[in-house]
């Protein structure tokens, strides 16, 4: 059973008590508006905090402490949900009943120490740690170009949402990493602690009351401002001509990424129909893009669609031979037009709904997915759970899917070609 409660001003806990698992999970998430001027710094903060605290000043002592806690794991979190950047920690730990002694409480104490009592040097973060994590972050950002599918999608989003917060990458931009100083990063950290909304997620055998009591004690030193910075996502709307962008690189396979506006975001009445549409169109192995564009016509090495539920955007990603790019684009649009006209077979329709319902059922048995879903809902200002979404999907009709398709409008096309020809 899921219970939500406010523990401190601007700090809310979602607790799911269950005995399904041998381990519990917990995450702490600081909600920030996705802005280029702070995105890279926000991405750095959790990694720097995990380098050392007052009691465990280096990685070796942190690892030793986690070993003492029956091999508990702690990691950094950097997520992008619409136009909200979420940073913080997650932890997995064995249940007290299986360990035969308290594990949850000392794990929470240790997380509190890592978060609130970092190792400092001259009143700010340790320079060695900051510079090391800057290199790691810069390498992670620079490596995006190595995955051409991800790169093409990123370039599409930058064009489609130019001038909007959504265009900012999850980890920030490469050129914003090098100027970060220990002093500036520490000041940003203090601001994030005080001025951000905080969402906590727990899943395990403890009652919500026990979890709340422990966390209120651990977070009693968390600074809280008089007001917290608002976060949210502006829905993408279509009212312009289709934009085209092309790049050339030394690649052997072309990439075709197409961005559409959906006119619908999570929480709206039509959202379940949009989910079914996405699955019919390109969201699975029974979809039109897979069975027809890829399998029957052999136009793509892969072709799939996905939606950003908080932004109102659908993206089609495909890998295509250079000489088939135009034909593939035409066929992808033709399949969407078939959806608009209600040309959806019984098999496509039922398979899509069954796939979505099965996926939601599987997610209910995955602490990580439940955490990600719950936090994504909070970032969108929504409260409903997966069970509510499943009921909505069950009620979707074929006519509603066609209507959802008619609201989907092509906005931007990004093409990646080779350097020759």
How would you label these PLM feature ranges?
Residues 16, 22-42, 59-113, 149-175, ...:
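M16 family metallopeptidases and their MPP-like homologs
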Residues 137, 143-145, 160:
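Glycine-rich, mobile lid/loop segments that gate access to catalytic sites or pores
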Residues 1-69, 173, 186-292, 329, ...:
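His/Glu-rich zincin catalytic helix
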Residues 179-187:
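Active-site glycine-rich loop that binds ribose-phosphate moieties when present
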Residues 52-55, 96-100, 117-126:
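Short, polar/flexible loop-turn hinges at active-site or ligand-entry regions and domain interfaces
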Residues 117-141, 229-237, 334, 338-363:
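Acidic/histidine-enriched alpha-helical segments
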Residues 139-143, 240-253, 358-367:
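Short, low-order "capping/linker" segments at domain edges
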Residues 78-81, 186-193, 304-307, 402-406:
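Short, flexible, solvent-exposed loop/turn segments with mixed acidic/basic and small polar residues
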């Amino acid at each position: 059973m899921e219970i939500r409660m406010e523990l401190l001003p601007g700090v809310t806990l979602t607790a799911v008590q269950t005995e399904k698992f041998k381990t519990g999970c917990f995450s702490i998430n600081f909600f920030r508006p996705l802005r280029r001027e702070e995105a890279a710094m926000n991405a750095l903060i959790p990694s720097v905090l995990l380098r050392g605290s007052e009691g465990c000043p280096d990685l070796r002592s942190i690892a030793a402490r986690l070993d003492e806690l029956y091999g508990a794991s702690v990691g950094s979190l950097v997520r992008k949900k619409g136009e909200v950047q979420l940073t913080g920690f997650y932890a997995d730990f064995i249940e007290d009943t299986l360990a035969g002694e308290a594990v949850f409480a000392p794990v929470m104490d240790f997380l509190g120490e890592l978060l609130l009592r970092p190792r400092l040097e001259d009143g700010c973060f340790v320079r060695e740690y900051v510079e090391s994590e800057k290199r790691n972050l810069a390498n992670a950002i620079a490596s995006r170009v190595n995955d051409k599918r991800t790169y093409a999608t990123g370039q599409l989003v930058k064009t489609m949402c130019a001038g909007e917060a959504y265009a900012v990458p999850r980890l920030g931009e490469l050129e914003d990493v090098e100027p970060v100083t220990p002093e500036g990063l520490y000041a940003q950290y203090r601001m994030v602690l005080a001025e951000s909304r905080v969402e906590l997620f727990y899943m395990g055998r403890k009652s919500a009351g026990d979890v709340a009591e422990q966390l209120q004690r651990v977070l009693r030193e968390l600074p809280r401002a008089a007001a917290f910075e608002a976060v949210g996502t502006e829905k993408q709307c279509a009212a312009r001509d289709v934009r085209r962008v092309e790049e050339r690189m030394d690649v052997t396979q072309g990439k075709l990424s197409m961005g559409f506006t959906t006119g619908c975001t999570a929480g709206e009445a039509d959202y379940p129909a949009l989910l079914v549409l996405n699955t019919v169109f390109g969201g699975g192995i029974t979809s039109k893009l897979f069975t027809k564009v890829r399998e029957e016509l052999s136009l793509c090495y892969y072709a799939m669609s996905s939606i950003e539920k908080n932004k109102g955007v659908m993206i089609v990603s495909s890998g295509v031979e250079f000489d088939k790019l135009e034909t593939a684009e035409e066929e992808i649009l033709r399949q969407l037009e078939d959806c608009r006209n209600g040309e959806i077979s019984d098999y496509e329709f039922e398979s899509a709904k069954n796939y979505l319902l099965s996926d939601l059922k599987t997610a209910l048995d995955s602490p990580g997915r439940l955490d990600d879903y719950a936090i994504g809902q909070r970032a969108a200002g929504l409260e409903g759970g997966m069970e509510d979404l499943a009921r909505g999907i069950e009620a979707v009709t074929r006519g509603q899917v066609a209507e959802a398709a008619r609201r989907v409008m092509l906005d931007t096309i990004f093409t990646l070609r080779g350097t020759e020809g």
